Amino acid sequence: MSRVCQLTGTRANNGMSVSHSHIRTKKLQQANLQQRRLWWEEENKWINIRVTTRALKTIQKKGLGKYAKSLGVDLNKL
């Protein structure tokens, strides 16, 4: 399974690791992904989904159905 948030589409960021002597090497900054079982209120069922912690925070605030709708994601396909 790829390291991509199923709601927001967030993926790894290419960056540089800079040492004390200023030598740069490439590094991947991975998204903080968590596998979660979330309750979908509108359909009265559980959904297993891989989301970032930032998306989880927004889901707690808005709700899973409203947040997915605002992003244009169809939860029935997940």
UniProtKB/Swiss-Prot annotation:
Disulfide bonds: none
Region (Disordered): 1-23
Keyword line: Ribonucleoprotein, Ribosomal protein
GO molecular function, one term: structural constituent of ribosome
Biased composition (Polar residues): 1-20
Cellular-component GO terms for this entry: ribonucleoprotein complex; ribosome
Biological process according to GO: translation
Keyword Cell cycle: no
Family named by the database record: Belongs to the bacterial ribosomal protein bL28 family.
The protein's name in its UniProt record: Large ribosomal subunit protein bL28
Lineage of the species this protein comes from: Bacteria, Bacillati, Cyanobacteriota, Cyanophyceae, Synechococcales
Name of the encoding gene: rpmB
